[in-house]
Amino acid sequence: MGLFDKKYCDICGEKIGLLGNRKLENGNLCKNCAKKLSPWFSDRRNSTVDEIKAQLAYREENQGKVAAFHTTRTLGTDTKVLFDEDAGKFMVTRARNLVEANPDVLDFADVTGCNLDIDERRSELEREDEDGNKISYNPPRYEYSYDFYITIFVNNPYFDEMRFKINSDSVDVTPPPAMRPGMATRYDPESNVEYRNCKKLGEEIRQMLTQVRKDVRERIEQAAAPKAAITCPYCCATTTPDASGRCEYCGGALNG
């Protein structure tokens, strides 16, 4: 086929415009269908048509989960982590219209880890000498820029991590000059209020996700643990409590 031959989307069958093709491993995808994929998905070019169809079915099912989602806690300012603690689910999004954005709804049990990373960049400050040339300070002075990133590692068939920036704008810090010329001083970014606030938010998100994962794992382990046989106080039978904590013979409530 020629470069400018007509192409059709292998998902919806619609004609693809000149700049609208999104290549798949064995086919073509239009930009409208591509928009429906998960925002955390990044392996489109290596995906087959059938794999994309399966993901779009998953995304359509996700719309029902978004509709049923009841936010009980929100962490974040720009990109937010929304929790439905009653249902044991969460989502990450910066969208205001959740129905339109259709952010992936995940179970607490899907979380496998969570990291907070602080990206530091520095650039040297210079001054002009008597001849107008830019020269370094003695000792050299720098200004710093910080960005704060959360990475949530998850079990999901279409992506294994969700990485996003906490702060909408970089935190820029210019330390004061040294008290004595020629003597270097150490600067602690923790003395900057904005830096501290961003780090605190990141730690809160990380701790929350780490805790809910721990709670889920503990419940799974408890459910899998063998239950000890006890004597029912009502029928005197030796019984193992059922899922409701009742005697398997007479149905009496057991405290053991």
Label each region the model flagged.
Residues 4-9, 27, 229, 244:
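Residues immediately within or flanking Cys/His clusters that coordinate Zn2+
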Residues 9-12, 30-33, 232-235, 247-250:
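Short cysteine-rich clusters marking metal-coordination/redox-active sites
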Residues 18-19, 39-40, 241-242, 256:
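Short, non-ligating residues that shape and space the ligands of small metal-coordination modules
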Residues 19-28, 240-246:
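Short linker/helix segments within small regulatory modules
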Residues 27-43, 250-256:
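Short Cys/His-rich micro-motifs in 6-15 aa windows
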Residues 37-104:
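Anionic N-terminal interaction surfaces
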Residues 87-135:
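Phosphoinositide-binding peripheral membrane targeting modules
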Residues 114-226:
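Acidic, Ser/Thr- and proline-rich intrinsically disordered linker/docking segments
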